[in-house]
Amino acid sequence: MANILEVKTKDGKLIRLTEKQWLHIKRRHPEMTTKIGDIEDTIANPTVRIQHSDETTKFYKFIKDEKKYIMVAVKILNGHGFVITTYKTRRL
């Protein structure tokens, strides 16, 4: 399956957004369908980055006009990163 997006994190890890996950995001979070650029920017230049113990990292970027964060959840396994989901939230 093709990748919709490939972007590097500040520490050089390559993160991919696959077509399969993009379909999931569009179905579950339709407000994100026009936000590919924001998703890319959130991964590349997050306001906040929270690493969890299960190989999941959450990247947040504050959107001033909306007073919300874009959250992008990423899983990194064996050096390969991929987007799990993304949505807007008021909380970290």
Feature map (PLM): residue ranges:
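Ribonuclease/tRNase effector modules and their secretory precursors
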Residues: 1-92
